[in-house]
Amino acid sequence: MLKYMLDTNIVIYVIKRRPLEILSRFNQNAGKMCVSSITVAELYYGAEKSEYPERNIAVIEDFLSRLTILDYQPKHAAHFGNIKAELSKQGKLIGENDIHIAAHARSEGLILVSNNLREFERVIALRTENWV
């Protein structure tokens, strides 16, 4: 049963195996983690603009083959609209992709694992953890 949605920065930490303590948390939660298709898009973007795109794409694809990837659906978009409107009213907007990822995790009842809690803590009813 899925419990956690990994943010892009957490995926990168696990792939790079730094910091080391993240690997034990990752391994302890095998089978309980997923990523959003939004995170997948961010990973491909990072690989494409890197010095070694082909190598980095292969690493990403190998890593993702071991995780569940959740597709972004209309119900997630509805949460996106709600979150963005609330943050806008407060004058506390966060990055567009971060809102999509937060909406995806919140609407699925998942805990978002990120090293960017300063922004994600602004999102009402989003459960978060930092494994770093």
UniProtKB/Swiss-Prot annotation:
Pfam families, alphabetized: PIN
Keywords: Hydrolase, Magnesium, Metal-binding, Nuclease, Toxin-antitoxin system
Molecular functions per Gene Ontology: magnesium ion binding; RNA nuclease activity
Entry binding sites for Mg(2+): 7, 98
EC numbers: 3.1.-.-
Cofactor(s) the protein needs: Mg(2+)
Alphabetized InterPro entries for the sequence: PIN-like_dom_sf (IPR029060), PIN_dom (IPR002716), Type_II_TA_system_RNase (IPR050556), VapC_family (IPR022907)
Ranges where the PINc domain occurs: 4-123
UniProt enzyme class: hydrolase
Subunit structure: Probably forms a complex with cognate antitoxin VapB2.
Family membership: Belongs to the PINc/VapC protein family.
Task performed by this protein: Toxic component of a type II toxin-antitoxin (TA) system. Acts as an RNase. Its toxic effect is neutralized by cognate antitoxin VapB2 but not by non-cognate antitoxin VapB1.
Protein name, entry field: Ribonuclease VapC
Source species of the chain: Haemophilus influenzae (strain 86-028NP)
